Amino acid sequence: MHVLSVSEINVQIKALLEATFLQVRVQGEVSNLTIHKVSGHAYFSLKDSQSVIRCVLFKGNANRLKFALKEGQEMVVFGGISVYVPRGDYQINCFEIEPKEIGSLTLALEQLKEKLRLKGYFDEANKLPKPHFPKRVAVITSQNSAAWADMKKIASKRWPMCELVCINTLMQGEGCVQSVVESIAYADSFHDTKNAFDAIVVARGGGSMEDLYSFNDEKIADALYLAKTFSMSAIGHESDFLLSDLVADLRASTPSNAMEILLPNSDEWLQRLDGFNVKLCRSFKTLLHQKKVHLEHLAASLKRLSFENKHHLNALKLEKLTIALENKTLEFLRLKKTLLEKISIQTLTSPFLQTKTERLNRLENALKLAHANLKLPQFGALVSKNNQAVELEVLKAGDKIELSNEKARASAEILSVDRV
């Protein structure tokens, strides 16, 4: 038997293996993944429960992957066996890699969704509120599309005062992504200017998933997320759910539905305004009545504090003081009378006491006179006889009397006395 060198046997093995396993499909779990930053080549192992085989994915093929290769993924690789003669190693030179059970596009989309979710692209807290009464709306669509025609028709019926501006955009095929991104940036550039748009609507009618798949692109997602203007995604039909729907501030199932969601119904608002007017009139009448009652209350309060009222209160106080003085005067006279009655006749013979008695009598008459003046009515006069105040009931016909008040004095004679 011919003896072979190591190099010779490895060369023969290489020729045999590479010819026999020129194209193979192998399924297994990705492990030991290494991606070289400089070369861009990916090196990994594919394993099952019993064996492991090394694999290589060169940069050109790696760039065609629509998803990110990660440890632990169950993959089906398509390629050929290659042998490295110097070490006698063999590996699978991968041409294509597909996820097991799902397509590469689906996996790529799921990975992109997870990436954007972690960046907060889907968070409700980061979404802008829908404008209540839009005046100017940018519609990113094809100006010759049925979607644009439907949107204009619905807008004119619902809210004709809103200005719709079509930004003509390529909505499918090569160049679609870049065209949409540029249109979003253009519409958003008017933000905070007098020509600012209240909303940006990215709209396209239905089509195949291939036609709509551009709206799953990360660049469009970035443009929508970074826009400072409220955005809506209205792509395809109700059953179509794309990445742009998740990132935009609001999703509409169709372009027509976008107008129904975004624009208020003018007929409904006219009815509501009528209702508001009725409520406003009713509230105004109620408020007016309340204010009238309040003013009447204030007027009554002011009247109580008026000059006339104060004068009346002072008159009442004066009357009370007069009565109090009268009572004190009468009490004083009674005390003095009692004291005089207790003084004996013998004591009164004393010149000193007689003088005091006369003085006391004068004081008594003065007090009676003062007492009479206190009770004197507004148009009355004091009645006196022999310079002493007397009551009418003690007078008799023929008595000479004097009538006096603060302003005058008069003499009179009693003609008759009628006792009541």
From Swiss-Prot:
GO terms for biological process: DNA catabolic process. GO terms for cellular component: cytoplasm; exodeoxyribonuclease VII complex. CDD domains: ExoVII_LU_OBF (cd04489). It is an enzyme of class 3 (hydrolase). GO terms for molecular function: exodeoxyribonuclease VII activity; nucleic acid binding. Its EC number is 3.1.11.6. InterPro entries: Exonuc_VII_L, Exonuc_VII_lsu_C, OB-fold_nuc-bd_dom. It is found in: Cytoplasm. Its main location: cytoplasm. It catalyses: Exonucleolytic cleavage in either 5'- to 3'- or 3'- to 5'-direction to yield nucleoside 5'-phosphates. Keywords: Cytoplasm, Exonuclease, Hydrolase, Nuclease. Heterooligomer composed of large and small subunits. HAMAP family: Exonuc_7_L. Belongs to the XseA family. Bidirectionally degrades single-stranded DNA into large acid-insoluble oligonucleotides, which are then degraded further into small acid-soluble oligonucleotides. This is Exodeoxyribonuclease 7 large subunit. It comes from Helicobacter pylori (strain G27).
